């Protein structure tokens, strides 16, 4: 029971609270639709947007449940309305949600560091590259699958795509708040403990 006395565990509810604030502020939904517009030329552009949003939102919440639940409510209905295959859309949401356990600040890594008596900072540093690599592989798989089988992820109609200037403006405005948070968390991760960081 002495494991629960570890002060590192204080970071868990605080990182969860940070994820809740990001979600309630509407940053994630705006980011998803901005990335969808920016990637409209790619096959499975909505799937790409969902996976990128999952990876970015993982840096604010650190758990699977929050990412899967939010993206399931946000991206899944949008993909189904756009004519995406249900199995493909479900796979994208579930795989993207799993990135939360790898990309810092991962709650799982914090708990594991306490149990295994390892440095949480070293675990965070070790998990960044695999997490981003996994996100990239998911995106490549979704794009390749949709390229060879366009029926599972139809391209959006051209009339639904706004001018390039509007897309650029929307991407900049939606990226700025979350990107600032990501830079802050990842830059301080090497010089501070997770408890202080949270």
Q: Language-model segments: which ranges?
A:
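Alpha-helical transmembrane segments of multi-pass membrane transport proteins
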Residues: 1-192, 196-198
